[in-house]
Swiss-Prot record:
Lineage start: Bacteria, Pseudomonadati, Pseudomonadota, Gammaproteobacteria, Enterobacterales
Keywords: Ribonucleoprotein, Ribosomal protein, RNA-binding, rRNA-binding
Gene: rplX
Listed name of the protein: Large ribosomal subunit protein uL24
Keyword RNA-binding in record: yes
Gene3D superfamilies (alphabetical): 2.30.30.30
PROSITE patterns cross-referenced by the UniProt entry: RIBOSOMAL_L24
One cellular-component annotation, GO: ribonucleoprotein complex
Organism in which the protein naturally occurs: Erwinia tasmaniensis (strain DSM 17950 / CFBP 7177 / CIP 109463 / NCPPB 4357 / Et1/99)
GO biological process, one term: translation
One of the Pfam families matching this protein, by short name: KOW
Length: 104
């Protein structure tokens, strides 16, 4: 099945503490979750690793979000938008449902 949201897409968060924030997709996980740059930041307590010369401490990093809690951001309309699929020149492409613009 083709993915509606892919790596490097710009998405907007629909629900949760980061509602309304936009970010770029860093990673799409097979469990139906995604990691977005600068969104859903959590503090992780990390032990030092002397063998790798890594200091310990509290590190802030991005946690995964459910893919259903984000939508693709349409820069033409400035809003979140739904994604559809169609065939153009024998290739399956994604498009925004509001204005039928093809997604690059």
């Amino acid at each position: 099945m083709a993915a509606k949201i892919r790596r490097d897409d710009e998405v907007i968060v629909l629900t949760g503490k980061d509602k309304g924030k936009r970010g770029k997709v860093k990673n799409v996980l097979s469990s139906g979750k995604i990691i977005v740059e600068g969104i859903n930041l959590v503090k992780k307590h990390q032990k030092p690793v002397p063998a790798l010369n890594q200091p310990g401490g509290i590190v802030e990093k991005e946690a995964a979000l459910q893919i259903s809690n984000v939508a693709l951001f349409n820069s033409a309309t400035g809003k979140a938008d739904r994604v559809g699929f169609r065939f153009e020149d024998g290739k399956k492409v994604r498009f925004f449902k509001s204005n039928s613009e093809t997604i690059k």
